Amino acid sequence: MEKTYNPQDIEQPLYEHWEKQGYFKPNGDESKESFCIMIPPPNVTGSLHMGHAFQQTIMDTMIRYQRMQGKNTLWQVGTDHAGIATQMVVERKIAAEEGKTRHDYGRDAFIDKIWQWKAESGGTITRQMRRLGNSVDWERERFTMDEGLSNAVKEVFVRLYKEDLIYRGKRLVNWDPKLRTAISDLEVENRESKGSMWHIRYPLADGAKTADGKDYLVVATTRPETVLGDTGVAVNPEDPRYKDLIGKFVILPLVNRRIPIVGDEHADMEKGTGCVKITPAHDFNDYEVGKRHALPMINILTFDGDIRESAEVFDTKGEESNVYSSEIPAEFQKLERFAARKAIVAAVDALGLLEEIKPHDLTVPYGDRGGVVIEPMLTDQWYVRADVLAKPAVEAVENGDIQFVPKQYENMYFSWMRDIQDWCISRQLWWGHRIPAWYGNDGNVYVGRTEDEVRQENNLGADVQLRQDEDVLDTWFSSALWTFSTLGWPENTDALRQFHPTSVMVSGFDIIFFWIARMIMMTMHFIKDENGKPQVPFHTVYMTGLIRDDEGQKMSKSKGNVIDPLDMVDGISLPELLEKRTGNMMQPQMAEKIRKRTEKQFPNGIEPHGTDALRFTLAALASTGRDINWDMKRLEGYRNFCNKLWNASRFVLMNTEEQDCGFNGGEMTLSLADRWILAEFNQTVKAYREALDNFRFDIAAGILYEFTWNQFCDWYLELTKPVMTGGSESELRGTRHTLVTVLEGLLRLAHPIIPFITETIWQRVKVICGITADTIMLQPFPEYNAAQVDEAALADTEWLKQAIVAVRNIRAEMNIAPGKPLELLLRGCSEEAVRRVNDNRSFLLNLARLESITVLPADDKGPVSVTKIIDGAELLIPMAGLINKEDELARLAKEVAKIEGEIARIEGKLSNEGFVARAPEAVIAKEREKLDGYAEAKAKLIEQQAVISAL
């Protein structure tokens, strides 16, 4: 085996070999249980980020673990067309390269351009997924706009429409005036902002007066430009100031519209003036108030966010109405919305109706892609009636057919599902699944899978003109069908029969509603088992936290704190990293700050760590459902782990290859250490499997690390040396056999988390064991064997370890050279301790570097010594001739003084109010941690001073 572990040499060739051999495919054995995971489809033209790497590592660990248990295992892979994101990338590209817009191209040519871009860049993410070691079945790869999935989408739309579960209606949506499309709540970013609250007088009509004799109401608003669309003023029905005015009217400033005063809980007596203007066409809360009180809806904005030349007036059903005039004062027509705000405030002020302006902190919704303020907009959109679909989806979680891990996410799911609104599924984009609806000149709407089908079903001749709806479906609509459409639905395929319902869905909690809930609703509506019972899409939902940077900040390009997972695998120089983080920025003014931070964090760039080290780190950080702060030190630690495993394996191979390891018969004697490591290994297998079965990847990683590093490498390999240098034939055979057997089992155990290094080493180890199989991937996963757990061997070895550690600690504390042989005396020994010393003298002499071991008679106190107490005995190391008392005390005094200086420095820092107020919490916590460490070190040194003074 190569002397040093170099992941760059082994990982890619190995993956290509696995893929070529077809090891990722299901085994097709229907007598075995199936296990299936659907990958959350990443954006087809995107690239892999830490969230992907994190979730995919968890999925691959589960898939490899189940595959090794002989299950018929499928990890379904695919990518998402990502409507708005992909369209924007291509729009930006043609603007930059050709100075054109999509309208210059026209719809068909622009869509061709996107398909072209997909062909060019669509391979990036799948290449990166291969680099992670993902054992997905590439032959089944799907794309949300491939032919099969497009047919499934049409099928679902048509069926839901025919069941009256899809309708077209005029409702309020999040409108992005820059992109000119409706967007989902997930694409809205709420930003804190310092704004104003304008207090405007609305004159009361018909001589009405308030309780304190005023002939107007004062209405407070943060959006005076929407005054033109008001159709009511709400007051709280319990408010003594205004309750007598409910049912009366005010005259709306600037347009002189007579609008009613309504009593509604939405008006808060404590907030503002207690009077709230109601603009149902431009505010989500007002829309609901308007529906409750049958207030008309007046839309005053164009799709670009400008004031219209004349308003659109609708009743609460969204039908055109002439209950109010559609006139808009000429001076506001065509004004951009924020210019209109200024003009309207000035006009209200000129009329003497502006009472006051107060500074006000508010939350403003921005489109996360377009970057402009989102406008609630009344538009014609297609909707899914969600309440009907939600009922069975809630029951499936209530009765345990679907379980959330961690369980607390069920509450989040229930709170959304029990208050579900109809789902707006149309988007004003070009890239996506075009809505299968056609309009006749007579205003009729026809829905069908194709135009031909529509004409046939409705007896429409070739002379009848039809035009297809321009809109496309929300990307989440096709993703909601992901678990069954990828398996070949609407055909009744073998894949559906074998792999649906799927086993586990791994997802971030941020899309629990947008994706998880909708998958449950859609699947249960369309997929039934042979008894007609609705099928769930998956049995378990495993929720991950979000990966943040080392300071707990969300990773984003604008913050310049994104770490590309493959840069940790392959390494990246500082100049390349800076270019990556500061090139093509939306906000170039941030570049300098980002450059400084990056130079401080990665002065030499990022070193290569290999995929296995990255995967191990991600698994170790996967604590349930909490956000995770990325830690480069952990990554280094797990790279060191891979090196340690490599070096330990070389030691095993050097001592066993071409040697008699007892696999072909011959007498074998197992030493205490052999029996102990077999017991430890089996206990590890049991705990590790339990952790994986309970989705505790962090605990599993910890168990693997602890056994490999501490028990196998640090203790067992050392404990084999006395046998290797002086054992009998049968002892040598026993120890070699144990070395190889435990290493081979350990490689299988670790394989799901660190696949590359384990396969590479296993290919060498299998030869010694006489295994002829081709790959570790399809080997049986280790099982717990209680017969190998020798309790006596565990107890005796723990005692030996205690004794060896005690001697090593005395060496370290007394500053005695590690190589200097020592004399060990034991005082006050129990019978058990005497037996253990006599049985294991060679281990003790060897590992504790002793020249002699003497058990003192009961009445012998022994010479002046440094002592340690262990189970059933006191260990003494005589100090005569080992140390110079004066020199040692002087050295310790120097050490204490140095530490006291550090303690004073940190205490000074922490008592500085300025530092504590300014420094991030993480920095303060680190300083406190250092302080505790120094205090502990000082206490130990003082203890040593006392011991040496007494000599």
From Swiss-Prot:
Give the classification, highest ranks: Bacteria, Pseudomonadati, Pseudomonadota, Gammaproteobacteria, Enterobacterales
| Family membership | Belongs to the class-I aminoacyl-tRNA synthetase family. ValS type 1 subfamily.
Cited function: Catalyzes the attachment of valine to tRNA(Val). As ValRS can inadvertently accommodate and process structurally similar amino acids such as threonine, to avoid such errors, it has a 'posttransfer' editing activity that hydrolyzes mischarged Thr-tRNA(Val) in a tRNA-dependent manner.
GO BP of this protein = valyl-tRNA aminoacylation
The family database entries (Pfam families) matched by this protein are listed as: Anticodon_1, tRNA-synt_1, Val_tRNA-synt_C
Q: Which GO terms describe its molecular function?
A: aminoacyl-tRNA deacylase activity; ATP binding; valine-tRNA ligase activity
Enzyme class, UniProt record, top EC level: ligase
What is the reaction catalyzed?
tRNA(Val) + L-valine + ATP = L-valyl-tRNA(Val) + AMP + diphosphate
The source's superkingdom equals: Bacteria
List where in the cell it is found.
Cytoplasm
Q: What is this protein called?
A: Valine--tRNA ligase
- Look up the coiled coil feature and give its residue ranges: 880-944
User: Which SUPFAM superfamilies would you find in this protein's record?
Assistant: Anticodon-binding domain of a subclass of class I aminoacyl-tRNA synthetases, Nucleotidylyl transferase, tRNA-binding arm, ValRS/IleRS/LeuRS editing domain
Domain text from the record? ValRS has two distinct active sites: one for aminoacylation and one for editing. The misactivated threonine is translocated from the active site to the editing site.
UniProt cross-references to CDD domains, sorted A to Z = Anticodon_Ia_Val, ValRS_core
Where does motif 'KMSKS' region map? 554-558
Which proteins does it associate with, and in what oligomeric form?
Monomer.
Spell out the GO cellular component terms annotated for this protein, sorted alphabetically and separated by semicolons.
cytosol
Ranges spanned by the short sequence motif 'HIGH' region, renumbered to the chain = 42-52
> Which keywords appear in this protein's UniProt record, sorted alphabetically?
Aminoacyl-tRNA synthetase, ATP-binding, Coiled coil, Cytoplasm, Ligase, Nucleotide-binding, Protein biosynthesis
Query: Which InterPro entries does the record cross-reference, listed alphabetically?
Result: aa-tRNA-synth_I_CS, aa-tRNA-synth_Ia, Anticodon_Ia_Val, M/V/L/I-tRNA-synth_anticd-bd, Rossmann-like_a/b/a_fold, tRNA-bd_arm, tRNAsynth_Ia_anticodon-bd, Val-tRNA_synth_C_sf
Q: Might you give the EC number(s) for this enzyme?
A: 6.1.1.9
The residues listed in the UniProt record as binding ATP, with positions renumbered to this chain, are 557
